[in-house]
Swiss-Prot record:
Gene3D superfamilies for this protein: Ta0600-like
Superkingdom, natural source: Archaea
UniProt xrefs under InterPro entries: Ta0600-like_sf, UPF0147
Protein name: UPF0147 protein MA_0092
Organism in which the protein naturally occurs: Methanosarcina acetivorans (strain ATCC 35395 / DSM 2834 / JCM 12185 / C2A)
One Pfam family cited in the UniProt record for this chain: UPF0147
Protein family per UniProt: Belongs to the UPF0147 family.
Length: 97
């Protein structure tokens, strides 16, 4: 049995980034999210929008910050779920782009 490798095109990766930025924007406008979390989310948005860095590096940096803030005890549950979903989406971006 052979495994199929699914290649993600750069358009797919760009769409993942676009969708993640939309969710991140909604988190920053949610007043129930603590200010320190919103600051971190703004930092992630800046990282993802920085096109001078390779896409996989931007995704990895963002995932690292998302992991840190997902452990914050003051994070509302609905936001924690969004953050886990964002991490999962960013993990789909291939390293070789």
């Amino acid at each position: 049995m052979t495994a199929k490798v699914i290649q993600m095109s750069s358009n797919d990766s760009a769409e993942v980034i676009r969708q993640c930025l939309q969710v991140l924007d909604s988190i920053t406008s949610d007043s129930s999210v603590p200010r320190n979390i919103r600051r971190s989310v703004n930092e992630i948005m800046d990282i993802l929008n920085n096109e001078s860095e390779p896409l996989f590096l931007r995704a990895a940096s963002s995932i690292s910050i998302l992991e840190d803030i997902s452990n914050d005890p003051n994070l509302p549950l609905h936001t924690r779920t969004l953050i886990w979903n964002l991490s999962s989406q960013l993990e789909t971006i291939p390293v070789d782009e």
